[in-house]
Regions:
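Protein kinase catalytic-loop region centered on the HRD/HxD motif
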Residues: 117-129
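AlphaC helix of the eukaryotic protein kinase fold
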Residues: 42-64
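Protein kinase glycine-rich loop
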Residues: 13-19, 24
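Activation segment signature within eukaryotic-like protein kinase domains
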Residues: 113-114
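Activation segment of protein kinases
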Residues: 49, 143-186
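C-terminal lobe helix-coil module of Hanks-type protein kinase domains
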Residues: 175-274
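Conserved short submotifs of the Hanks-type protein kinase catalytic core
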Residues: 80-94, 98
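Activation-segment/catalytic-loop signature of the eukaryotic protein kinase fold
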Residues: 76
Length: 290
């Protein structure tokens, strides 16, 4: 695929990533003289016309989102059997890779990244777009520490049967499913808040709360399983931060934060003091329900 030119405009270079549905290439937009990322659907999806229509529709809707914490979509196109999305090229690594390399993060870093991800979700939700697949693999971290979410709306194009696909990307999504997603039920912004809570848990502890040998077992754990509090796995977890994570991941949507903005407010209400050694220590947290 390298050196191919799409639409007479996008010259493909090296492969830079791969997910359950697609392969991502670095490319050059010869018209605007800039580098971009191009996500190309894998061949096994191109004959599902209902999926393709939904994929294009959701991608075009997501292209309307312009926010500092969202990866911009520039173009959606097709050339023969190649269906593609042209996106902002981000220098950095996925949050998934960051966690694998660094392990559990200091809680000030968890809070800073969580606020950025929540800000992206809040903006999308106000524009009536639900992500449905918030997970570390879909969050890019730039060298200056900015979090940028990708793949907005794409998960809506994937039917429920794909969770049993044998690709790592789609199976990986089950670790972040809300209980209502696991049941195949109604999904709204509170489902994204649940998934972000799981991401926060993983950033803080270095592991997901529910794991198993197959996607069905993991999905059932989201519905019925009891989550081990982060403080049982990592020393020094501030109770106020743990409270926020557990509220995000409540089994019942009505008990979660009402919106991503409310979650941001709770994170902003966490108070820190500096120690003699120069470290930040969380001393208080005021949540709306307290």
């Amino acid at each position: 695929m390298s050196n191919k030119v799409l639409a007479g405009r996008y010259e493909l270079f090296e492969r830079v990533g791969e997910g359950g549905m697609s392969v991502v290439y670095k490319a050059k937009d010869k018209l605007l003289n800039r580098f971009v990322a191009i996500k190309i659907l894998k061949p096994e999806f191109i004959n599902d016309h209902k999926f393709i229509d939904s994929f294009r529709r959701e991608s075009q809707a997501a292209a309307s989102l312009s926010h500092p914490n969202i990866v911009n979509i520039y173009d959606v196109g097709r050339e023969g059997n190649i269906h593609y999305i042209v996106m902002e090229l981000i220098q950095g690594k996925t949050l998934s890779d960051y966690i694998k390399e660094q392990g559990p993060m200091p809680y000030p870093k968890v809070i800073a990244l969580s606020k950025q991800i929540a800000a992206a979700l809040a903006f999308a939700h106000k524009n009536h777009i639900i992500h449905r697949d918030v997970k570390p693999h879909n969050v890019m971290i730039t060298p200056n520490g900015t979090a940028k979410i990708t793949d907005f709306g794409i998960a809506k194009a994937v039917n429920a049967a794909t969770i049993v696909d044998n690709t790592e990307g789609i199976i990986g999504s089950v670790h972040y499913f809300s209980p209502e997603q696991a049941r195949g039920g109604y999904v709204d912004e509170k489902s994204d808040i649940y998934s972000l809570g799981i991401v926060m848990y993983e950033m803080l502890t270095g592991r997901v709360p529910f794991d198993g040998d197959n996607p069905v077992n993991i999905a059932l754990m989201h519905i019925n399983g009891e989550m081990i509090p982060p403080s049982k796995l990592v020393d020094g977890v501030p109770p106020a931060l743990e409270h926020i994570i557990l509220k995000c991941t409540d089994k019942y949507p009505v008990n979660r934060f009402a919106s991503a903005d409310e979650l941001i407010e709770a994170l902003n209400n966490l108070e820190f003091v500096s120690t003699v050694e120069g470290d930040s220590v969380l001393v208080n947290g005021k949540n709306r329900d307290e």
